[in-house]
Amino acid sequence: MFRGHFKHTVDPKGRLSIPAKFREALADGHGDKVVIVPCGDALEVHPLQLWHALEERVNGLPRFDPDRRRVQYAYISLAQDVTLDPQGRIQIPADYRERVGLVKDVLIIGLTDKFEVWDAERWAHFQRDHDGPLDDLFERLAGKGV
């Protein structure tokens, strides 16, 4: 489980140290292999096993389903396998850093089954734009059984 948020930095070589708490979560059954994929304003980081499960669900859709093809072209095709180095870092390719605006200061946020890496400034803007009472959200989620 990935919970919480952590301030970190991307070094000039594009390496990012994964928080110890998240490394522990990966070690509990997931190992040191992850899948990274840029999505919107963030870089998603998925445990390899959970990514494989996602791919299987997508592959379970009819072969010519337009949604299947779109998610394969626009999302899955961008995914890249990455292994944590002995210091617990991942290497983020330059084009991925550019795509989601990762320069130096980042926020790593846990989203239960995955985590995301955000440029700190973009995250602050996102938070401001989505700030407010959560009562309506919690009510909608309760209606969905959460």
Where in the sequence are the language-model features?
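Short, structured motif recognition centered on aromatic/hydrophobic residues
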Residues: 14-18, 88-92, 96, 115-117
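A positional/architectural concept
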Residues: 2-43
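A short beta-strand-loop micro-motif that forms or neighbors metal/cofactor-
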Residues: 28-43, 79, 101-118, 135
